[in-house]
Swiss-Prot record:
Its EC number is 2.1.1.74. It is an enzyme of class 2 (transferase). This is Methylenetetrahydrofolate--tRNA-(uracil-5-)-methyltransferase TrmFO. One of its GO terms (cellular component) is cytosol. Its cofactor is FAD. It comes from Pelobacter propionicus (strain DSM 2379 / NBRC 103807 / OttBd1). Catalyzes the folate-dependent formation of 5-methyl-uridine at position 54 (M-5-U54) in all tRNAs.
Amino acid sequence: MKHSLTIIGAGLAGCEAAWQAARRGVSVTLHEMKPEKRSPAHHLPGLAELVCSNSLRGDSLENAVGLLKEELRRGGSLIMEAAEATRVPAGGALAVDRQLFSDYVTAKITAHPLINLVHGEMDAIPAEGTVIIASGPLTSDALAASLSGLTGDRLYFYDSIAPIVTADSLDREKVFAASRYGKGDGDDYLNCPLDREQYQAFVEQLNRGEKVAAREFEKLVHFEGCMPVEELAGRGEDTLRFGPMKPVGLTDPRTGIEPHAVIQLRAENREKTMYNLVGFQTKLTWPEQRRIFRTIPGLERAEFVRLGSMHRNTFINAPALLQPTQQLRSDPRIFFAGQITGVEGYVESAGSGFLAGITAARLLTGMPDPAVPPAETALGALVSHITNADVRHFQPMNVNYGLFPDLEGRIKKKERRGKLAERALASLSGWLERVSPPSRETGEPTGAEQVDLA
């Protein structure tokens, strides 16, 4: 067929990309290494396997991931269709039966006449044709070696994530803005000062905190520059304050003296609506992170948009390598999608695949523009972040309202998320009119919606 697309990886991103491209009349060859070869984390034989939790997180528009799900629903997402068809009771979250979910997606993909599913490992990137790489966080060694030829030293094999808090949840009476030795702009960093007693209590909490147990395939050899903060605390009382919590070159303007220790917060985006805890990569459990980090002066009411983690995760430095369309700058016939781009989470991976599939199809069928979604939408905010973030400090990110452009005018904090969601869905409507396939979707078989889950 004239318009053909190769997709490597049939997880959530790859399946969503294949579905969106096929809906637009593009012939897709979808490569999946299972069942011939499996990663240590995969157990089911089918496509779109949920490796960790069976939850796609909150469904409310008060959460950015809830908004992202609604945008995908309105865009005709296969992954959201499968989730709704296989959901199980989970309060305010959208959780699924993972076996039925995989079965549903597998049935839809294999039934589509424009999608050719090929089993077996792809150990190299095709030299010709349009390609979407959606090989996921556990990309095989052979494929990773091929990818390194495209990405150089900007392909990573584990993440080292520090928590991120919203700027408006910080207590500005306790934190102060300053860069070490007065270098840089005054508010490049915010600083949380600790006296000796506060520091000792904090170190003790880190030593006692509950840690996440690493699965066998996630056991890491930590480099000194990426050591979990709790491991540093365990080396001795003063290790942290001579490491990431060192106070040298910082003077608290309220006391006129150098604090005993300091936790620095660095702006995560240009708008400075989010700050990350510098050097605070951690393997503490999420409840422990919230509890312990809220004992830090100035963070007592911190709202966390991302919590820390360290685990096996193959991903690229997307802002250094990708265009806003998720195309490789050095070779635009190649797209990346899913967690390998640096998005974090099931729904985010599906969203990334959704966009890659649409854009690849538009380019292959000669549409006039790639139709990048508006930055006001969850889809647009997420892809804008991963392709425009600070190259020097890039780490995986899930969708959150801190990524969105500010609202105009003064909005009450409790109304902000609702207004952001309202604006997003209004922007989405016009965008979907441009990118949606014809009402009669090319090649989709009659009754394809019906999947027997018995």
